[in-house]
């Protein structure tokens, strides 16, 4: 087996006597107080940005007021707000999200201003579940600012990224016979730790997706492979933020680095462990574009052996723009999981293979050698930390 929004308090924006104010509603409490990310360097920018937008978009936002709390989810309108262009969209209603607790407010369905999408906000899950077609789920941890009863995502660019990855993909939920195999990776605590890492990566503007054995376990059995020794996620190399590594090195993260292999432009891999909670090792791979004749023909992640040999795991062009539910936690996944899993594990992916009999650098169907680091290079690209 180879080896997450920012909550902050907006001051009253006294831009006019009727401008934005906070509502003490259950809706706001659920979306903001319980579920938002804490802290982060983008807060000052967001405050300035929102103040600017509300100064120029007050009348537009007020025109969307309703009698019950609603969430603005219309990506086109949000992008318009983010660009500080506040003309009403013509020819179509504005898409808003409404909690199913307000199903009795049937007059909303007759309001020509809106396209209604109902959602559920299950306290046992860390995502909002939209009853759209196709079904969409997004992390519930994002901050909002209120204009009357209209909740507007505070960080519009981040919300748009969530929505872009919102299409729900289901798992197969196959029964996998396992006689006497030891449970090394309890599913729920390990998934919870992985969700904490997801949140830290999101805070650093990275959008991780399941990969390797963790993708296989989710897709095949809607869970975590119980005998696996680690968890696998990937981040596109072009999205990687070195600030995250610096935060861990400065003890500003809930995770510590156990191993660091490769370079950010070649076969980069981090093995992380949580400082608290269930002890699980999580491998974070950078995923690179495979370019041939000027076109992206595949994606790949790397591996490094102790002797310096590099390995390359190739996949069809990756499309991690769908969302999955893993024990109540949202994780992003490829929209074509069967294709990626067959490429890595072969046509018999639905059969269990003990981790003890699986070689990380030879068992995969998509792995091949990819050169070798020199002894001098290995001093820089192969680091194991004992702390």
Swiss-Prot record:
Q: Which residues form a coiled coil?
A: none
Q: Which GO terms describe its cellular component?
A: membrane
Indicate whether Transferase appears among the record's keywords: no
**Membrane topology for this entry?**
Single-pass membrane protein
Q: What keywords are assigned to this protein?
A: Membrane, Transmembrane, Transmembrane helix
State whether keyword Cell cycle applies: no
Where does the UniProt entry say this protein principally localizes? membrane
InterPro entries reported for this sequence: FKTN-rel (IPR009644)
Report which superkingdom the organism of origin falls in: Eukaryota
Subcellular localization(s) per the UniProt record: Membrane
Question: What's an example Gene Ontology biological process for this entry?
Answer: protein glycosylation
List residues traversing the bilayer. 5-25
* Listed Pfam families: W02B3_4_N (PF24413)
Q: Which family does it belong to?
A: Belongs to the LicD transferase family.
Name of the protein: Uncharacterized protein W02B3.4
**Species:** Caenorhabditis elegans
């Amino acid at each position: 087996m180879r080896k997450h929004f920012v909550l902050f308090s907006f001051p009253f924006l006294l831009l006019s006597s009727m401008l934005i104010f906070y509502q003490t509603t259950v809706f706001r409490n659920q979306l903001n107080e319980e579920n938002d990310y804490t802290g982060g360097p983008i807060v000052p920018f967001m405050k300035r940005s929102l103040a600017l937008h509300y100064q120029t978009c007050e009348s537009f936002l007020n025109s969307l007021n309703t009698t019950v709390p609603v969430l603005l989810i219309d990506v086109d309108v949000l992008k318009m707000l983010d660009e500080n262009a506040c003309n009403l969209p013509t020819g179509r209603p504005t898409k808003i999200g409404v909690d199913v607790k307000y199903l009795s407010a049937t007059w909303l369905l007759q309001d020509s201003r809106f396209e209604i999408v109902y959602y559920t906000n299950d306290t046992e899950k860390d995502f909002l579940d939209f009853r759209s077609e196709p079904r969409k789920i997004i992390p519930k941890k994002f901050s909002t600012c209120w204009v009357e009863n209209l909740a507007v995502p505070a960080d519009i660019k981040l919300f748009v990224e969530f929505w872009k990855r919102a299409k729900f993909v289901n798992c197969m939920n196959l029964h996998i016979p396992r006689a006497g195999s030891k449970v090394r990776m309890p599913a729920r605590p390990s998934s919870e730790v992985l969700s904490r890492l997801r949140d830290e990566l999101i805070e650093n503007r990275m959008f991780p997706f399941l990969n390797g054995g963790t993708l296989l376990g989710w897709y095949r059995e809607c869970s975590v492979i119980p005998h696996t020794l680690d968890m696998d996620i990937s981040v596109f190399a072009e999205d990687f933020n070195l600030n995250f590594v610096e935060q861990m090195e400065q003890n500003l993260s809930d995770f510590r680095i156990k191993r660091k292999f490769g370079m950010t432009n070649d076969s980069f891999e981090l093995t992380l462990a949580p400082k608290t909670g269930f002890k699980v090792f999580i491998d974070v791979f950078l995923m690179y574009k495979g370019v041939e004749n000027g076109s992206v023909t595949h994606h790949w992640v790397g591996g490094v052996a102790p002797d310096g040999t590099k390995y390359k795991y190739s996949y069809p062009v990756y499309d991690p723009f769908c969302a999955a539910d893993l024990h109540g936690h949202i994780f992003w996944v490829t929209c074509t999981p069967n294709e990626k899993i067959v490429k890595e594990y072969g046509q018999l992916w639905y059969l269990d293979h003990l981790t003890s009999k699986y070689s990380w650098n030879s068992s995969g169907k998509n792995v091949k050698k990819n050169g070798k680091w020199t002894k001098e290079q290995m001093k820089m690209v192969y680091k194991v930390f004992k702390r």
